[in-house]
């Protein structure tokens, strides 16, 4: 189980990313389309003034059951341990053991 503070930090980051997504994407698009170097510099400064945690890069995929940050399968949102455990119990529809 991950520390509660780390899970809370990621939840906070997720909310902040959602809050600033429109503004950040508009600035990034303007930055890509700007031809004048001074205009690009000004837009870059505006992007830098946004909160650091509003960047989607800073979010971390975590297991929704345990909060573990590593070995998380995107399709299920579960870490490898929980995925294996739940698949053996038959709690994941469509998941079967492979045999060849």
Swiss-Prot record:
The lineage of its organism: Bacteria, Bacillati, Cyanobacteriota, Cyanophyceae, Synechococcales. InterPro entries: Ribosomal_uS14 (IPR001209), Ribosomal_uS14_bac/plastid (IPR023036), Ribosomal_uS14_CS (IPR018271). Belongs to the universal ribosomal protein uS14 family. Binds 16S rRNA, required for the assembly of 30S particles and may also be responsible for determining the conformation of the 16S rRNA at the A site. One of its GO terms (molecular function) is rRNA binding. Keywords: Ribonucleoprotein, Ribosomal protein, RNA-binding, rRNA-binding. It comes from the Bacteria. Part of the 30S ribosomal subunit. Contacts proteins S3 and S10. One of its GO terms (biological process) is translation. This is Small ribosomal subunit protein uS14. It comes from Synechococcus sp. (strain RCC307). GO terms for cellular component: cytoplasm; small ribosomal subunit. Gene3D superfamilies: 1.10.287.1480.
